[in-house]
Curated annotation (Swiss-Prot):
It comes from Bartonella tribocorum (strain CIP 105476 / IBS 506). Belongs to the pyruvate, phosphate/water dikinase regulatory protein family. PDRP subfamily. It comes from the Bacteria. Keywords: Kinase, Nucleotide-binding, Serine/threonine-protein kinase, Transferase. Its EC number is 2.7.11.32, 2.7.4.27. Bifunctional serine/threonine kinase and phosphorylase involved in the regulation of the pyruvate, phosphate dikinase (PPDK) by catalyzing its phosphorylation/dephosphorylation. The keyword ATP-binding does not apply. The keyword Membrane does not apply. This is Putative pyruvate, phosphate dikinase regulatory protein.
């Protein structure tokens, strides 16, 4: 019998979008498997009125408070109220900034313009996500040259989820299927400023994934899931990548995050060499 999780309130305040804060909060909360966090998120806290509204809710539902704010007056007010109602209040950037300051021997100068950098990063990721969705599975191939990364591979090699993951990190990503006897789009071969990477996996893994996919009536399902056919598709994909000098990543035993990490490393080298 599964025990019901205990709940607690997790308040996260930021003078920006709060995405870094949320990621940290959720990562830590997930370590406590017998507890369930009730999240209260307060982004774009820029003035005392906005902070006081958040504080009203914190007083009603006390819990752990995490924050990232530059304004010293707002930080002091938040810390004062949390101390008064006896709840933890943690500035998640403070120890990191202190470590940088200590190691570099240079005091930290927090700047308001850093907020604009955060906003620019947020919109860059939104733009990348829009591009990636538009260029999923070979769609909108006419402007592939705008992509930072183009993933190629046969069906069920994690091209789409990997593309979405990269887009959420601000990388414009397109993915193009490699299908035997189907010509590659000219726009793919002309994308000289994009890093093109082949994704492959074992025939066993691909067959297993394909068997769990409903493709509707009239589809040649046996051919699609047959390991011998899949092995031939993989040989074709490898030959294409070898022909054009595209690096290949085997995703058989990699998580999406691990695949993305390998892509980031390749992208860094690619940009250095340009």
């Amino acid at each position: 019998m599964t025990k019901e999780k205990k709940s607690f309130h997790l308040h996260m305040l930021s003078d920006a979008t709060g995405e870094t804060l949320i990621s940290v909060g959720r990562a830590v909360a997930s370590q406590y498997t017998t507890y369930q966090a009730t999240e209260h998120i307060y982004p774009m806290i820029r003035n005392k009125i906005q902070l006081e509204k958040a504080l009203d809710e914190i007083k009603q539902e006390p819990g752990i408070v995490l924050y990232t704010m530059i304004d010293e007056e707002l930080k002091l007010l938040l810390q004062k109220i949390c101390k008064k109602i006896k709840i933890p209040c943690i500035d998640i950037l403070h120890p990191v900034l202190n470590a940088f300051q200590s190691y570099l021997g240079t005091p930290t100068h927090l700047r308001v313009s850093a907020q604009h950098d955060l906003n620019a990063d947020y919109f860059r990721r939104i733009e990348a996500l829009d591009f990636t969705i538009e260029h999923d599975d070979g769609q909108s191939s006419s402007n592939l040259f705008e992509a930072d990364v183009i993933l190629v591979g046969i069906s069920r090699t994690s091209k789409t989820p990997t593309s979405i993951y990269l887009a959420n990190r601000g990388i414009k990503t397109a993915n193009v299927p490699l299908i035997p006897n189907i010509d590659l789009p000219e726009s793919l071969l002309e994308a000289k400023n994009s890093l093109i990477i082949g994704l492959i996996a074992s025939a066993e893994r691909i067959s297993h994934i394909r068997q769990n996919r409903d493709l509707g009536e009239g589809f040649a399902f046996d051919n699609y899931t047959n390991r011998i056919n899949i092995a031939e598709e993989l040989i074709y994909a490898k030959r294409i990548c070898e022909r054009f000098g595209w690096p290949v990543i085997d995703v058989t035993r990699r998580s999406i995050e691990e695949t993305a990490a390998a892509i980031f490393e390749l992208l860094s080298r690619f940009r250095e060499e340009k």
